[in-house]
Amino acid sequence: MTDAPGFPLFPHPHLLGIKGLSPADIELLLERADAAVAISRRPEKKLATLRGRTQINLFFEASTRTQSSFELAGKRLGADVMNMSVASSSTKKGETLLDTAMTLNAMRPDILVVRHSAAGAAALLAQKVGCSVVNAGDGAHEHPTQALLDALTIRRKKGSIAGLVVAICGDVLHSRVARSNILLLNALGARVRVIAPSTLLPSGIGQMGVEPFTKMGEGLAGADVVMMLRLQRERMAGTFVPSVREYFRFFGLDAEKLKAAKEDALVMHPGPMNRGVEIASEVADGPQSVIQEQVEMGVAVRMAVMEALLDPRRNGDGA
């Protein structure tokens, strides 16, 4: 994977979303990530690929899993990684997102990893800074590296994504993970279903190329992959479900409901999980679960993305 000999040049300076990526772009990142998995599994994991490069993780929303994954990915590539704690930063004193970005830009980082509660925040920063920007989640808009790691997990287990039936279940309305996965899975030829109470399905969801269901049994029937989503209560302005108990009864994935899917169906969850709300422990920890594999694939995907964005050929420095 060092300097990725043999891989075509990734044609984009930033990763702001799955929207705008071609199937070939997606496949390129997945192939790079496959190579990163092998590196992450060997005793000596550290590369010098990004030695001398600076990565700043700028997280305005808390995320232990994603921030740690990006940090580890950068360190495995040899980058100097700085985690900016927003809780102790100037943003708490009234500094705007753009002010913060311009301050960081003056430090001349090579890559900025951004998570923010506002949709479009990463795209806005990409217009204002002189480095590559990776969207680590912007409001309910997109979370591209999550979709890529989910695709890598599926592909390594199933061989191909084309033709698979993937059921995305839960709070689709508020989920950036759902949006990015729908875009990616459709691009690679999967048949995508979404399952949720009608209150948690976006209006016009069918126009995104998915088949909507409001009953778990119908939506899970014959599914190859079941992707569960948590209730995004922090993004809910009103009451979308009667109660947690009622929600689990109808939309929580337990062993009985899972029987509707194929026997070898994969069970996925982007985390963090709410056991007993959207998924039962017997399923989350069961033989069909690939949730821990998703975490492993996350580091590999983020290594691949950052290496692709900082490819020396982009500046004419490489072959």
Curated annotation (Swiss-Prot):
GO biological process assignments: 'de novo' pyrimidine nucleobase biosynthetic process; 'de novo' UMP biosynthetic process; amino acid metabolic process
Binding annotation for L-aspartate: K93, R176, R230
InterPro entries: Asp/Orn_carbamoyltranf_P-bd, Asp/Orn_carbamoylTrfase, Asp/Orn_carbamoylTrfase_sf, Asp_carbamoyltransf, Asp_carbamoyltransf_Asp/Orn-bd
Cellular component GO terms held in the UniProt record: cytosol
Enzyme class: transferase
Protein EC: 2.1.3.2
Domain of life: Bacteria
Pathway(s): Pyrimidine metabolism; UMP biosynthesis via de novo pathway; (S)-dihydroorotate from bicarbonate: step 2/3
Similarity annotation: Belongs to the aspartate/ornithine carbamoyltransferase superfamily. ATCase family.
Assembly and oligomerization: Heterododecamer (2C3:3R2) of six catalytic PyrB chains organized as two trimers (C3), and six regulatory PyrI chains organized as three dimers (R2).
The protein, known as: Aspartate carbamoyltransferase catalytic subunit
Native species: Chelativorans sp. (strain BNC1)
